[in-house]
Swiss-Prot record:
Keywords: Cytoplasm, Magnesium, Metal-binding, Pantothenate biosynthesis, Transferase. It comes from Yersinia pseudotuberculosis serotype O:3 (strain YPIII). Catalyzes the reversible reaction in which hydroxymethyl group from 5,10-methylenetetrahydrofolate is transferred onto alpha-ketoisovalerate to form ketopantoate. GO terms for molecular function: 3-methyl-2-oxobutanoate hydroxymethyltransferase activity; magnesium ion binding. It is an enzyme of class 2 (transferase). Its EC number is 2.1.2.11. It catalyses: 3-methyl-2-oxobutanoate + (6R)-5,10-methylene-5,6,7,8-tetrahydrofolate + H2O = 2-dehydropantoate + (6S)-5,6,7,8-tetrahydrofolate. Transmembrane segments: none annotated. 3-methyl-2-oxobutanoate binds at residues 45-46, 84, 112. This is 3-methyl-2-oxobutanoate hydroxymethyltransferase.
Amino acid sequence: MKTTTMSQLRQWKQEKRKFATLTAYDASFAQLFAEQGIQVLLVGDSLGMTLQGFDSTLPVTVADVAYHTRAVRRGAPHCLLLADMPFMSYATPELAFTHAAELMRAGANMVKLEGGSWLCDTIRMLAERAVPVCGHLGLTPQSVNIFGGYKVQGREEVAANQLLQDAIALEQAGAQLLVLECVPVELAQRVTEELTIPVIGIGAGNVTDGQILVMHDALGITGGHTPKFSKNFLAHSAGDIRAAIKLYIEEVEGGIYPAEEHTFQ
């Protein structure tokens, strides 16, 4: 099996070929996802909520993410593997480089940072030192206390224009990939068309180059509130996890998921 690379993702964008991604936190699920055809995985700081039982991602540490990154890498050696930089782990460019290096040594191919134009110096520093970066705009969970909860971002014209400018700035600083979370579909389309780098959506409609879901949401095992953008693929697959993942991939690649009911206007 060939290793998935950023060059492939850029080619997929040019070919308008959509791709599906998932979060993963251990070797067993990572292997299962890879065997069904998932080629990009994220060790998300969402592990703080899905695995550790916290009510936000803020308590997650770099050591936590590194531990799970090593496990996922062992289970899916050929996937393009992203690792989240936890809250305050990139407060300065120097701190970001130290922690990014730790995650790269753990097996990540790329690190993901949440934030807008203020991150450009950090992204530039990392890119110059051979650390690939994925940006993250829209609803950035590490900023939950500023947002006052998990709310759709970019609905007002001023906010939408700022997000678009932030996306352009992140790409110019050296980001190779962008995650866009919980934004109106019209804004997601503007960002996806404006950028030359691939854009992965979550709660951003079916107009982005790729889609990502937290694995627990895709399998319908999330306790409590279920996000509007999520779909329980396991329930549509007679309880067969492998079939559920294949269905997720098929619906993303076919532009079926996310449907209108999963989309914000």
